[in-house]
């Protein structure tokens, strides 16, 4: 066994795929998830893929007493912290809920790590910290701009809290700034499982093509891009999960050069909404109904990653294509029925 790793939000989209990769690499995995944005059945999918059923605790990490009780005596080598509320629109309506949950859970976990400084800590951050960057592709040194939402602000503030605590307590920590995760495990046993109306492009697209939703709305066709639609960096969730393993290995080997290291995770290539639609139809043979709608407030024109630091330092690069991501997302949708 390589080590014992806690994955918070471990039954969520990225957390479940990371748990599968950890198990495949020989780690012992402990999952924590309060099921606020997923279902317990994801555990069955993890077991079906890996042949192992990791321990799962259903607790609220934002509750200091519950968090302390759950982690007491766990002897963790690493924590990968995904658990967070993540709906941008809801965060604008209910900012206090987002600050209490996202920052409360983070601080409770850091309290544990501060008492166990040999435990590496990986934070699920986001490219939202950059806003509309002045230059593309976006490097990790690009200025962090005022957040567009309380959700985005919890990622910015979260990074600062981690940095200050890590410096003060001599901790080893990494923040991974994701671009746009898509796709699903090739087995179609786990994938993105939005409760209610999907907030992200690809699950809405697959549900629409499956006849579960009406036509897809493409928000904005007047952006200063080649086809007028917004451009993002779409990365396969399995590539993303594997980056967490490489980041964890860096921390466990005590190779980090700063108390908090930051890495972008993306493909380095931007794709417009229309390009994603065309890739979906090309890769799956399914047809999609869509129409243009006005831009959404807060949406930026374009964002895609400079991934040189992750490549040079972690030895990680995204391998899966947009078409492969579309095929896997569609297979997952078909498996859901």
Where are these regions (language model features)?
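Catalytic core of nucleotidyl cyclases, primarily class III adenylyl/guanylyl cyclases
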Residues: 187-189
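N-terminal Rossmann-like NAD(P)+-binding domain of SDR-like oxidoreductases, especially those catalyzing
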Residues: 1-184
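Short-chain dehydrogenase/reductase
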Residues: 99, 148-156, 191, 195-199, ...
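Short, flexible active-site loop motifs that bind/organize anionic cofactors or intermediates
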Residues: 9, 57, 69, 81, ...
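Amphipathic alpha-helical recognition patches that constitute DNA-binding helices
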Residues: 13, 149, 177, 192, ...
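A general boundary/transition motif marking the beginning of the first structured unit of a protein
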Residues: 114, 192-197, 298, 317
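C-terminal substrate-binding subdomain of Rossmann-fold SDR/epimerase-dehydratase oxidoreductases
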Residues: 201-337
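A generic fold-level signal
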Residues: 93, 101, 145, 168, ...
């Amino acid at each position: 066994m390589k080590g014992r790793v806690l994955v918070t939000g471990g039954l969520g989209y990225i957390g479940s795929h990371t748990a599968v990769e950890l198990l495949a690499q020989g780690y012992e995995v402990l999952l924590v998830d309060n099921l606020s944005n997923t279902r317990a059945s994801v555990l069955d999918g993890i077991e079906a893929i890996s042949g192992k059923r990791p321990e799962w605790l259903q607790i609220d990490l934002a509750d200091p007493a519950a968090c302390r009780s759950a982690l007491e005596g766990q002897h963790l080598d690493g924590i990968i912290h995904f658990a967070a509320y993540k709906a941008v629109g809801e965060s604008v309506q209910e900012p206090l809920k987002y600050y209490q949950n996202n920052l409360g859970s983070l601080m409770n976990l850091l309290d544990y790590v501060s008492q166990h400084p040999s435990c590496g800590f990986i934070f699920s951050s986001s490219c939202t910290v950059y806003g509309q960057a002045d230059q593309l592709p976006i490097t990790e040194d690009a200025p962090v701009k005022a957040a567009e939402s309380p959700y985005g602000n919890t990622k910015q503030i979260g990074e600062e809290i981690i940095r200050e605590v890590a410096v003060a307590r001599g901790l080893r920590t990494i923040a991974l700034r994701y671009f746009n995760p898509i796709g699903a495990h090739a087995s179609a046993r786990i994938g993105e499982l939005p409760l209610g109306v999907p907030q992200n492009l690809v699950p809405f697209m697959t549900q629409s093509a499956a006849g579960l939703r009406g036509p897809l709305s493409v928000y904005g066709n007047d952006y200063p891009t080649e086809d007028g639609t917004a451009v993002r960096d779409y990365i396969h969730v399995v590539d993303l999960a594997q980056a967490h393993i490489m980041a964890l290995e860096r921390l466990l080997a005590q190779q980090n050069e700063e108390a908090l290291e930051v890495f972008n995770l993306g493909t380095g290539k931007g794709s417009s909404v229309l390009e994603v639609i065309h890739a979906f139809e090309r890769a799956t043979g399914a047809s999609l109904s869509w129409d243009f709608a006005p831009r959404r407030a807060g949406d930026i024109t374009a964002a895609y990653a400079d991934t040189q630091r992750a490549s040079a330092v972690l030895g990680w690069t995204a391998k899966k294509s947009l078409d492969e991501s579309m095929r896997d997302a569609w297979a997952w949708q078909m498996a859901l029925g």
